[in-house]
Amino acid sequence: MRVLGIETSCDETGIAIYDDEKGLLANQLYSQVKLHADYGGVVPELASRDHVRKTVPLIQAALKESGLTAKDIDAVAYTAGPGLVGALLVGATVGRSLAFAWNVPAIPVHHMEGHLLAPMLEDNPPEFPFVALLVSGGHTQLISVTGIGQYELLGESIDDAAGEAFDKTAKLLGLDYPGGPLLSKMAAQGTAGRFVFPRPMTDRPGLDFSFSGLKTFAANTIRDNGTDDQTRADIARAFEDAVVDTLMIKCKRALDQTGFKRLVMAGGVSANRTLRAKLAEMMKKRRGEVFYARPEFCTDNGAMIAYAGMVRFKAGATADLGVSVRPRWPLAELPAA
């Protein structure tokens, strides 16, 4: 069975084709980073217009890459939420229209379920059950996963997501958008211990996160210590260490609470090398395993949507003729497969 996946939830247009026997047959991606860089963040209207321009050509490119035609596609999956409503509507409209024209099922996919299942695309996929750390620009969540659609929210950010805090702090340090990866690169040149940032909400029970205060702490540290290159690098190092330590502490608690031996990292921030190294070290000490997708599948992409669509299609999920999206869509509302 072959599923075409369409991802347009934010500022990446991702198209992929997944075969349940052969794996990933095609993967096309267009990033709008340069388009939004001058504005310091994603402009929803510009994102939607660019998806309109790029989605169909990328579908054609994916078919060409795979050597397939429309007749070879068994279902069309598209991101139905959460995300920017205009951007979501582009992918949903194209996906639903193609499914109708090709006379195949249309499968609405939850964007965060796509991220959560992205490590399943690797050669050594995780088995259930596991604790999932979904960490991106829009979400920071700890989830108990016992099967497809069997998701229990253990904790989440009560304000800024970790990725959002990275980008905002990077902007304070004078870095371009998107600043998260640039901040991490700068942090690698920083001196550990010169500045010590707090580890928010680790001094109390629970699995929720709060990262907005770290941005304020960074702003005050910059104000009080100047902006020479080494100071900026030291501040970046202190900030990244604080975020990584906070995530690690909460992951430990979640693993203790569930008793699970497997940890899955997903979302854009899961590509962070420091976070990967620290969590890998932690799981080795616990005699457990950590899983994550390759870096290009940590950020938004069509491959994860094609795979999640295939899983949902096998479980009997389909869409009606209407085109509907959900900009806000709790993961816990998904049915079990």
Swiss-Prot record:
Protein's cellular compartments: Cytoplasm
SUPFAM superfamilies: Actin-like ATPase domain
GO molecular function annotation: iron ion binding; N(6)-L-threonylcarbamoyladenine synthase activity
Keyword match Repressor: no
Signal peptide positions (record): none
Alphabetized Pfam families for the sequence: TsaD
GO biological process: tRNA threonylcarbamoyladenosine modification
Cellular component terms per the entry's GO annotation: cytoplasm
Annotated EC: 2.3.1.234
Keywords, alphabetical: Acyltransferase, Cytoplasm, Iron, Metal-binding, Transferase, tRNA processing
Cofactor binding: number and manner: Binds 1 Fe(2+) ion per subunit.
Cofactors (names): Fe(2+)
Top-level taxon of the source organism: Bacteria
Catalytic activity: L-threonylcarbamoyladenylate + adenosine(37) in tRNA = N(6)-L-threonylcarbamoyladenosine(37) in tRNA + AMP + H(+)
Binding site for Fe cation: H111, H115, D300
Chief site of localization: cytoplasm
Enzyme class: transferase
Binding residues for substrate: L134, V135, S136, G137, G138, D167, G180, N272
Listed NCBIfam families: gcp_kae1, T6A_TsaD_YgjD
Entry-linked PANTHER family: TRNA N6-ADENOSINE THREONYLCARBAMOYLTRANSFERASE, TRNA N6-ADENOSINE THREONYLCARBAMOYLTRANSFERASE, MITOCHONDRIAL
Family: Belongs to the KAE1 / TsaD family.
Protein purpose: Required for the formation of a threonylcarbamoyl group on adenosine at position 37 (t(6)A37) in tRNAs that read codons beginning with adenine. Is involved in the transfer of the threonylcarbamoyl moiety of threonylcarbamoyl-AMP (TC-AMP) to the N6 group of A37, together with TsaE and TsaB. TsaD likely plays a direct catalytic role in this reaction.
Protein name: tRNA N6-adenosine threonylcarbamoyltransferase
Source organism: Escherichia coli O139:H28 (strain E24377A / ETEC)
